[in-house]
Amino acid sequence: MGNITKRGSKGRAADGPKALEGSTAATLHVQLCEAIMRQDCAALRALLRSHPVNQPMTILTSSTGCSLANSRLFLSQETLSFLPIHLAAKYRKAQSLLCLLEHGADPEARDTQGFTTLHLMLLNWPITSTTWTKPRNKIQTMLTDVQRNAVLCLRILCAHGAQVNARVDSGHRHCPLHLATIYGTHLVLSILAQNGAQVNAQNGSSMTPLHMAADILNKEMMQTLIAWGASVNCAVSSTGNTALKLAVSTASSKAGRLLAAGLGCIRLLLVHGAQVNARDHDGQAAIHEACFGGREVIINLLLEFEANVNILTRNGESPIHMYLQRGSNIRDTALLARLLFRSYPLRLTNNQGKLPAGILLPEFHLLRETLLKLSQKPLSLEDICKRNVRNIYGEKHKQLLKRLLPGKIWNSVYGYHDLAHLLK
């Protein structure tokens, strides 16, 4: 509620060029507030003859004539102070908003927290479900109407020259597209982009809207931003994270695993050219995040797009090292076997010589000893060649190689290997 300010008892006199006194100013402000909320444009036009359109209204919470002042939301405040246009935008009163703009209301006027009219509209965007195509009951119909009014207000603001790239003065210094990614919908992103919003704008944390959409795994928003030219390989300057790394991190989390979320978002980025082996400032790539999370479908998808399973972080950690950090990963022996088969040289320790925490657990004592022996055992030239062929061509060109190579050789490259075979 950025445009609501709390005032003490000393500052209750109305300010502005007219300097209306006492009950006259209070009554006028209440009437103006009610006219905006009722969308009574005739009354609004008449009241604006006595009240400058860009002058704040001050409403006492004790006022019995203003439904807004009696709202439970504001009971802790003595007065409410806001611009008429901010009130119309926040409560999605399209007719009042248009009337105010036609009478010279400034959409770029900011409240005490540095929010413009557009910022406030986005901060108060209505929450509706995207799972229904048509409303099936009265509640859904009402929510659909609320959403429609919000879109209409947004179009009105844009048509009257609202600055779609204006940053919030405080906090994370979001642009409207960042706010729309957090609070809005993909349609809001599209409307803002149509009106000149910069899709690769960075906020105070150096994140673009695509970074934020990827971080919350919102595929519709990601599709919209990419369609409007968002860079899929732009990195957050403070961390080096790309949209792919953020999406993989969220999808590989416990919540991502439980909800089976994010695979479509990751594939979307990869299909549109995301660099699968891009690394952050710590040298971590998406495959490191995926292996630590241990979610098989994500690891397989990254491998399909030629993720390098031998890439090291700045601390010398390989993807297999990350995978072996967690006991739950190690119990998936089939996935462990596939990763081991692709890893050469097999690097178990980091630059400090430390082993992954998972294989230090007592229950994995025998496995730890076997893996250490395997890491010290040089492979034959034939096995090295097989691993290189598989790592270079991956799953994407698997069927092409099947047509080109003799069946016996192809089977030796792409055949399934169980853990017992690898660790004998």
Curated annotation (Swiss-Prot):
Keywords of this entry: ANK repeat, Repeat
Gene Ontology CC: nucleoplasm
ANK repeats: 80-109, 113-169, 172-201, 205-234, 239-278, 282-311, 315-348
Keyword Transmembrane part of the UniProt annotation: no
InterPro entries, alphabetized: Ankyrin-SOCS_Box, Ankyrin_rpt, Ankyrin_rpt-contain_sf
TM regions (residue ranges): none
Entries under Pfam families matching the protein: Ank, Ank_2
PROSITE patterns the UniProt entry points to: ANK_REP_REGION, ANK_REPEAT
Protein name: Ankyrin repeat domain-containing protein 61
